[in-house]
Amino acid sequence: LALARAKGVDPKQITALILDRPRHAALVAEVRAAGAAVRLISDGDIAGIIFTASPEETGIDLYLGTGAAPEGVLAAAAMRCIGGQMQGRLILDTPDRRRRAAEMGIENLDRKYDLTDLASGDVIVAATGITDGALLRGVRFRPDRIQTETLVYRSEAGTVRRILGEHRRGLT
């Protein structure tokens, strides 16, 4: 693994997080064959990517896999705010996808996009938990109030704010 070389560690000291999907079976086998550990998640790919920015706390060194473009852009925006790195490529594996890409003005169908290609300028990301996840608690309904947990990231300031909200019921 290139990451192990860059960090100056044995591949056995690297942990890759991968979304547990049939399309990733060959990728999981390849990472394991290289000697790295694999942790599989059933959902939460954006949170998984965010975890790579603090490997000392999360034990996750990199996130690998394919997914939808909107999630990729959201993850890139969060990584811009917290100082991570990310690369992505469009998967244009059908004639229809290639046609749609051409209609949107994409000329280089094999281009590798970096973090600033995916999320440029002063980026602000706000995410509120709906259901419990690894990154945020879900909405809690109490008799007189509703509790929420939100993360707000800003690239220009380099800040991450965790907001625990209390919303009184019955107000319009």
Please name every model-derived segment.
Residues 1-40, 133-134, 140, 146-171:
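Acidic beta-strand-loop-alpha-helix segment within the catalytic core
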Residues 1-9, 18-99:
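Conserved mixed alpha/beta catalytic, RNA-binding, or beta-rich assembly cores of soluble enzyme
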Residues 11-13, 59, 120-122:
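A general structural motif
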Residues 63, 68, 80-172:
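Anaerobic metallocofactor- and corrinoid-dependent redox/one-carbon enzyme cores
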